[in-house]
UniProtKB/Swiss-Prot annotation:
Keywords: GTP-binding, Magnesium, Metal-binding, Nucleotide-binding, Nucleotidyltransferase, Transferase. InterPro entries: ADP-Glc_PPase (IPR011831), NTP_transferase_dom (IPR005835), Nucleotide-diphossugar_trans (IPR029044). Its EC number is 2.7.7.91. PANTHER family: GLUCOSE-1-PHOSPHATE ADENYLYLTRANSFERASE LARGE SUBUNIT 1, CHLOROPLASTIC-RELATED, GLUCOSE-1-PHOSPHATE ADENYLYLTRANSFERASE-RELATED. This is Valienol-1-phosphate guanylyltransferase. Substrate binds at residues 177, 192-193. Pfam families: NTP_transferase. Its cofactor is Mg(2+). One of its GO terms (biological process) is glycogen biosynthetic process.
C-alpha cells in the first residue's frame, strides 16, 4: 500500500461521556475489557499492512503521545505511530519517554480540516515521497477492518474521494452524517446530522482522499467563512465541485462511541450469543499479560467477559470486568462495565452501570429491545 498516508484524528475531552470522560482523554477510554477506543483504528491500520499512522491531536497531546509511544511503538515490527513535528524526539527514545518536546510553533486548530492544514508537511508525505492518498480515521470508533480492499477499489475507480458508509435504522440517522448515492455508486448527497433524514445510509467516518485533490480544496477553503471541518466543509465542497466521490459499504460491525449510553450499549453487544466483536478480534493493549475469557456460565459469573486476575467473591452477570478489579462478598453486578482496578464493595448490587477506577458509579440506560447502531 505504498503511497497511502494514514492520518488519525484524535480529539480530546469526551464531555458527552460524563464521569467516564472526566479527567481522561476520550481516545484512551477503556473498551471491551481489552483496549482503549483509539487502539481499534491503530490496529486496523497495522492489520491493513500500512507502515505507520500519523497522529493529529491537540488536547493534552503530550499525555496521549506518551501513552501511545509506550503501548504501540516498538511492539510491532515494521509499524509505528508517527507524531509529526514531535516524532524525531520520540524516535530517539525507544521504549522510554523523551524528557522534553520541541516548542509548539503552529496555531491552534479549530477543527479536523485545520489539523490537516497546519500539519500539511507531515500529512501529505509518505516516507520520503509525496503521498498519493490520504486515509482519514478517527479515534473513537470501534470496529475491525482491513482498508486494503477499499484502497484498491478507490485506485481502480480513479475517484477523488471514497467515503465509507453503513446502513442503519432511519430513526437514528439524525445522529450521523447522512449520505445518498446514485445507481452507479456515486455520492449525490452528504448532510451532517440532518433534521429530516431521507436516507438510511450514514457516513462511517473514515474516508480515502486523492492527496492532491484534498490539498487543493483545503487551500481553497482556507481564509473563507468555514467551519474548519472535513465533514461540514471539505466533503460538501468536493461534492459541489463535481468531484468523483464513491462509496464503500461497511458490512461488518462499526460503532461510533459518542455518548456514555452508546458506550454501555456497545459492551452489551460483545456479550451476545453472536457477539458484535469476538475477544480475539479486539486489540489487547490494557494489561496484555492478563488473559481474558468470555464466560458463558460458572460459579459467580455468567455471560460475561472477565479478566483472569479479577478477585470475585460475588456474582457477575452480563458484564465486562477489566483486569485488577474486585467484586466484593455478596456483591452483584449485572449489565455493568467494571474498569481496571475498580472495587465493588461487599453487598453492593449494581445494574446497568459503569464502575470507574476510583469505585464511583455512573448509571446508564437499562437494557431494552433495541437494534444497535
Amino acid at each position: 500500500m505504498d503511497g497511502v498516508r494514514a492520518v488519525l484524528l484524535a480529539g480530546g475531552e469526551g464531555r458527552r461521556m460524563g464521569p467516564l470522560g472526566r479527567g481522561r482523554l476520550k481516545p484512551l477510554v477503556p473498551f471491551g475489557g481489552t483496549s482503549r477506543l483509539i487502539d481499534f483504528s491503530i490496529a486496523n491500520v497495522h492489520r491493513s499492512g500500512l507502515r505507520d499512522v500519523l497522529l493529529l491531536s491537540q488536547y493534552e497531546e503530550r499525555r496521549l503521545m506518551d501513552d501511545l509511544h509506550l503501548v504501540w511503538n516498538g511492539r510491532h515490527r515494521g509499524f509505528r505511530i508517527d507524531f509529526g513535528p514531535y516524532d524525531a524526539v520520540y524516535r530517539r527514545s525507544p521504549g522510554k519517554l523523551p524528557e522534553q518536546l520541541p516548542e509548539r510553533t503552529w496555531p491552534l486548530e479549530r477543527g479536523t480540516a485545520d489539523a490537516l492544514l497546519t500539519k500539511a508537511e507531515y500529512v501529505f508525505r509518505q516516507g520520503d515521497a509525496e503521498a498519493s492518498e490520504i486515509l482519514v480515521l478517527h479515534a473513537d470508533h470501534v470496529y475491525r477492518f482491513d482498508y486494503g480492499d477499499m484502497i484498491r477499489e478507490h485506485r481502480a475507480s480513479k475517484a477523488a474521494l471514497t467515503v465509507s458508509y453503513q446502513r442503519i435504522e432511519r430513526r437514528y440517522v439524525h445522529l450521523f452524517g447522512m449520505v445518498e448515492f446514485d445507481g452507479d455508486g456515486l455520492l449525490t448527497a452528504f448532510e451532517e446530522k440532518p433534521d429530516d433524514p431521507t436516507s438510511d445510509l450514514v457516513f462511517a467516518a473514515f474516508c480515502l482522499f486523492d492527496a492532491a485533490t484534498l490539498r487543493r480544496y483545503l487551500e481553497q477553503l482556507r481564509g473563507t467563512d468555514w467551519q474548519h471541518d472535513i465533514s461540514r466543509d471539505v466533503i460538501p465542497a468536493m461534492l459541489a465541485g463535481g468531484e468523483l466521490i464513491r462509496g464503500y459499504e461497511v458490512k461488518s460491525y462499526w460503532e461510533d462511541i459518542g455518548t456514555v449510553d452508546r458506550y454501555h450499549r456497545a459492551h452489551r453487544g460483545l456479550l451476545r450469543a453472536d457477539p458484535t466483536l469476538a475477544l480475539s478480534d479486539m486489540p489487547l493493549t490494557v494489561a496484555p499479560e492478563v488473559p481474558r475469557h468470555l464466560v458463558p456460565g460458572g460459579p459467580g459469573r455468567r455471560a460475561s467477559v472477565v479478566a483472569a486476575d479479577v478477585a470475585n467473591e460475588g456474582e457477575i452477570v452480563s458484564s465486562v470486568v477489566y483486569p485488577g478489579a474486585r467484586i466484593g462478598v455478596d456483591a452483584h453486578v449485572v449489565d455493568c462495565v467494571v474498569l481496571p482496578g475498580a472495587q465493588v464493595p461487599d453487598g453492593t448490587h449494581l445494574a446497568s452501570a459503569i464502575v470507574l477506577e476510583d469505585g464511583s458509579v455512573q448509571q446508564c440506560e437499562a437494557e431494552r429491545e433495541e437494534v444497535a447502531l
